[in-house]
Amino acid sequence: ETGAALCGEQEALLDELLEPELNALMDSEHSLDIKQLALCSVIKRNALLRRWFAQHNKTMPSRQQILRLWQEVALAKADAEPKLQFYQDEVRRYKQRLYLVPIIDDPVNKIIEWPLTQSLSLPSGLGVLSLTTATGKNTVRAPSKDEKVTVRFGLTQTSLRIVGREHARHSKKIWQELDVAPWRRTRIPLIYYNDTLIAALNTFVTFEGKVTSEYAITIEWREAH
């Protein structure tokens, strides 16, 4: 009893001591800085990684899994896109950071009609779309009467002109320039009017979606976390 209580106290103390360090390693998307983690001792790094899973309310990985995560994902070759599955999630690496990414049914090839009059629940638990009165980065021209609004996933167009860039560019290049991690590229809702791409929500508006008159709408995407 005393041993177990002491052990529990030590864990609680570790939580308290490591919490500020873990928070310092994380960004707004809760990804971890690999370079900083690499400076820690193995014991400390393992403890930080375990607490990272705990912060996400995930099942605790074993010591062996944590070691694999470090070797196979964090230390993978620079040009690799490594990932390791933990139950319903994957740990992935992008730009020297570790991300915990939920595994979802790929929504690519789904085309969802959206009448705009009501909010729209996205497939694969990707959140909810609705119109808002505020203007923001998802402010686009309003559709004309003969334009049907659909939501799609996964860019098929190769060449795009987006607001804020002068020339048309390859879609892959745009994702890279805007720092969108590869797995997010198929999870960002794309707004189409008929077959014309208007916007990738929270990311860019195309030339065709640019506001040119007072008729504009703003779409809010509430992502599920």
Residue spans for each PLM region:
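AMP-forming adenylation/ATP pyrophosphatase catalytic core
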Residues: T2-H225
